[in-house]
């Protein structure tokens, strides 16, 4: 005769989100000891997670929060869009984000060790991965803590949670323009804030490429410097936020838009699921 009750099964399911039969079997194996049953389920979950270790996690969601003068952005990855839109996965992302924010974590390593109730974020993710049957990973974390922050989350499909997330750090008072800049970043995907932030070796590599292209096109040698600089300007427009044409008015650069609004963008982070 089983030495546990339906209430024990319910408690185990509520605490771990495990299935009915998994909970019953764990309680049988644990002789009715709930804490031991939890350890049994977690151990089985860890073994399952190990088997899933090499699987690709190209789906998931981004989530963000602004609190106490800082903005935090995370990407939580899974294997399929079916799990990405699952209520348990979305609830997990909310719990992970709350724990990361509370800990002030700014890296994945710090975030995984952040307390999440009676366990760490790493353990919380591991438990839910076992329940959902997919590899789940906290892929990226960013934390910005300047004067002001603005957040923008974008859905690429109405059936899925946000797939693109942006946080912007800025000084100034025009929050509406700051949010518009966050939307621009989501659309234009700059890699750097200003042209001065682009690594010198990357600039020189691009210079070598456009020089070779220009010469192969038979451009006059005397005209090459001007042509090369023009093409480098196009390169900076691709990779540097302030050099880009503003998405809502391509007759203006982002730099001119923020200057006109009295803003100074001091940093940003952009995550796209799977990218």
Curated annotation (Swiss-Prot):
Ranges for the region named Involved in Mg(2+) ion dislocation from EF-Tu are 80-83
Q: Which UniProt keywords apply?
A: Cytoplasm, Elongation factor, Protein biosynthesis
Q: Does the keyword Cytoplasm apply?
A: yes
Q: What is its main location?
A: cytoplasm
The family database entries (InterPro entries) matched by this protein are listed as:
EF-Ts_dimer_sf (IPR036402), Transl_elong_EFTs/EF1B (IPR001816), Transl_elong_EFTs/EF1B_dimer (IPR014039), UBA-like_sf (IPR009060)
Query: A GO CC term?
Result: cytoplasm
Pfam families, A to Z? EF_TS
Taxonomically, the superkingdom here is: Bacteria
GO molecular function terms listed in the Swiss-Prot or TrEMBL record: translation elongation factor activity
Q: Which residues form a coiled coil?
A: none
Q: Where in the cell is it found?
A: Cytoplasm
| CDD domains with a match to the protein in the record | UBA_EF-Ts
**Cysteine-cysteine disulfides:** none
* Physiological role: Associates with the EF-Tu.GDP complex and induces the exchange of GDP to GTP. It remains bound to the aminoacyl-tRNA.EF-Tu.GTP complex up to the GTP hydrolysis stage on the ribosome.
Q: Which HAMAP family match?
A: EF_Ts
Matching NCBIfam families:
tsf
| Family assignment from sequence similarity | Belongs to the EF-Ts family.
Name of the protein in its database record: Elongation factor Ts
State the organism named in the record. Answer: Clavibacter michiganensis subsp. michiganensis (strain NCPPB 382)
What's the gene? tsf
